[in-house]
A protein has these predicted regions:
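Expand to "…catalyze enediolate/carbanion chemistry for C-C bond making/breaking, isomerization
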Residues: 1-191
């Protein structure tokens, strides 16, 4: 365990990226081993070790709005009470930092990792648009909310296509809340 080498155990209110020594080590590993050239490897995110209710020092890390819009306010409360908000934040930060997937030691974490690993309709179509471009340049996303730079975003697009092959692509309008609630409900596979 990386933190164990330094006698550190992060609190459940912190992500691994809040622990500087661990975040710096992850950055070095990704820089050395996670490149998109032929020398790179797939690197998964570190384990999230918390799963039970506890007294919180900091505010929860999940916004209310997406859950209100999906009639899932109680579900959000359940996620927060089980420290899943920290896990969801860390999964998002893992991907932003070049990690793919998550090391899981508790069965309750599997659904969250899978839900946030699915490729959104928007990501998928942006990736296809980038990969279809034959020359450099910039195109507006079909969602009209960002620019897709054909050369700089090419490696990102390739990784999105790989992730789509492993975890699937959501339908248009399906949110992470939809996926989380569907995966948390036994026998539900509609999203």
């Amino acid at each position: 365990d990386m933190c164990g080498l330094f006698g550190i155990r992060r609190d459940r209110d912190l992500t691994i990226y809040d622990v500087r020594v661990a975040a710096d080590a992850i950055a070095s590993i990704i820089n050395r081993l996670g490149r998109c050239d032929s020398s790179g490897h797939v690197i998964t995110g570190p384990v999230w070790e918390y799963f039970a209710d506890h007294e919180r020092m900091f505010q929860p890390m999940l916004r209310h709005t997406p859950f209100r819009e999906n009639d899932a306010v109680y579900f959000r409360q359940q996620l927060v009470s089980r420290d899943m908000d920290g896990l969801l934040r860390e999964i998002t930060l893992d991907r932003a930092n070049g990690l793919h997937g998550k090391t899981v030691i508790h069965p309750a974490h599997v659904a969250a990792v899978h839900a946030l690993s699915a490729v959104t309709h928007e990501e998928y179509h942006d990736a296809l648009d980038i990969l279809a471009g034959e020359s450099g340049g910039v195109r507006a996303s079909s969602y009209r909310n960002k620019m897709n730079e054909l050369k700089p975003h090419r490696n990102w697009a390739l990784r999105v296509i790989d992730r789509a092959a492993a975890f699937g692509v959501t339908r248009q309008g399906v949110s992470f809340v939809d996926l989380l609630t569907a995966l948390a409900s036994p026998g539900s596979a509609n999203s």
